[in-house]
């Protein structure tokens, strides 16, 4: 499908990641360039930022995500990469890293381009990543924000275009669990909304693309991008729940242990927990653990908490996650058994056997040489004695 202003969520993500890397700061002042106005339509959404205007990165993020200013997307792109083209390359690279296989960016703001497209699933992926950043959550969850006066403008007041958060643009759609994220409308993409909501520890994202207004029975207009998003989120909270699918302190396998007089095996357990949002009626017994031990047998000593393998949890072919398996107790080494094993290994070593064989051969040769030498000495001694006796006659 064609992208619209949901593109700006990816733009905001890359800006936030640049801040995390220390390449930018929220308070850093940016001077608006003339090139930031490139490729913008005259009737597109704007914050009326002018070339030469000086404004902070944080205020630009509000301009980007509340009034959906197209020029703010280009200004921030230049702040991160120096030029818009390099930033677009970074957008596509990040999309691939996040697993967005059906997405290609051709600009920073979402205005129509034949080479600019995505899927609802991909939008969910990069929106989920964006919402991990405090600054983005703060901005998209704000109903109204005042950008302070700049060198070229009086203060600007902007209202969130997301009717799930604010009645300013459209009445009757506020949803008390909503926390964002971004509206978007172009003639080609239709009316779109990426929304997110939180209920307790459960967090859901809904994506509506290409919605068209409908007329209610009373003649009023139903903006489906908002009403259907709320319906989806409420359905999600009714039918899904945050579930812990692996408990710590439950041994799941044993590893054999040698060189110890205290124990001949040690139990292993998963460390940490895996939590997923799962259907409320899902049979957790159907989740399959796959145990992978580094070794079936290890030598003592073993330390409590020592990583001995991994456990992967899978349901219907989907991998939920992997946990380390650690030893539940320590197992001390027997020094007697250890020394005996060293001696056994010494004599079992093929190199040692060759050396011992060579030593044995040398010893046999030396012994034979000694025997021959002694035999010759006796012979010479006997011959000498016989000669002396004959000389007296």
Show where each model-derived region lies:
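Domain-terminus/edge residues, biased toward the C-terminal soluble/receptor-binding domains
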Residues: 100-104, 114-117, 121-382, 392
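Active-site-adjacent loops and short helices of periplasmic peptidoglycan-processing enzymes
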Residues: 1-134, 139
């Amino acid at each position: 499908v064609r992208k619209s202003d949901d593109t700006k969520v990816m733009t905001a993500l890359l800006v936030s990641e640049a801040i995390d890397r220390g390449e930018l700061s929220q308070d850093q002042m940016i001077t608006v360039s003339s090139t930031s106005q490139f490729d913008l339509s005259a009737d597109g959404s704007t914050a009326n930022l002018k070339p030469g205007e000086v404004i902070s990165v944080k205020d630009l993020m509000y301009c980007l995500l509340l009034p959906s200013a197209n020029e703010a997307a280009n200004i921030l792109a230049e702040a991160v990469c120096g030029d818009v083209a390099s930033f677009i390359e970074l957008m596509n690279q990040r999309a691939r890293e996040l697993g967005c296989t059906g997405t290609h960016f051709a600009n920073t703001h979402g205005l129509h381009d034949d080479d600019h497209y995505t899927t609802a699933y991909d939008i969910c992926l990069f929106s989920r990543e964006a919402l991990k950043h405090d600054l983005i959550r703060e901005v998209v969850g704000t109903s109204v924000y005042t950008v302070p006066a700049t060198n070229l403008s009086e203060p600007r007041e902007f209202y969130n275009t997301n009717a799930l958060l604010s009645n300013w643009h459209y009445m009757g759609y506020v949803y008390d669990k909503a926390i964002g994220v971004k509206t978007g409308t172009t003639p080609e993409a239709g009316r779109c909304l990426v929304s997110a909501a939180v209920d307790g520890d459960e967090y859901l994202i809904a994506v509506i693309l290409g919605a068209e207004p409908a007329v209610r029975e009373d003649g009023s207009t139903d903006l489906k991008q908002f009403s259907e998003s709320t319906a989806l989120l409420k359905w999600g909270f009714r039918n899904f729940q945050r579930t812990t699918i692996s408990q710590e302190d439950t041994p799941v396998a044993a590893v054999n242990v040698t060189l110890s007089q205290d124990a001949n095996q040690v139990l292993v357990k998963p460390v940490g927990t895996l939590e997923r949002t799962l259907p409320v009626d899902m049979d957790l017994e159907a989740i399959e653990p796959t145990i992978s031990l580094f070794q079936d047998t290890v030598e003592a000593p073993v330390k409590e908490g020592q990583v001995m393998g991994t456990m992967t949890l899978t349901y219907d072919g989907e991998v939920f996650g992997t946990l380390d398996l650690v030893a539940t107790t320590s197992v001390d080494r027997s020094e007697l058994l250890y020394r005996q094993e060293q001696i056994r290994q010494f004599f079992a070593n093929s190199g040692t056997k060759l050396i011992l064989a060579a030593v044995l051969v040398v010893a046999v040769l030396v012994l034979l040489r000694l025997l021959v030498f002694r035999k010759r000495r006796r012979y010479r001694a006997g011959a000498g004695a016989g000669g002396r006796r004959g000389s007296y006659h």
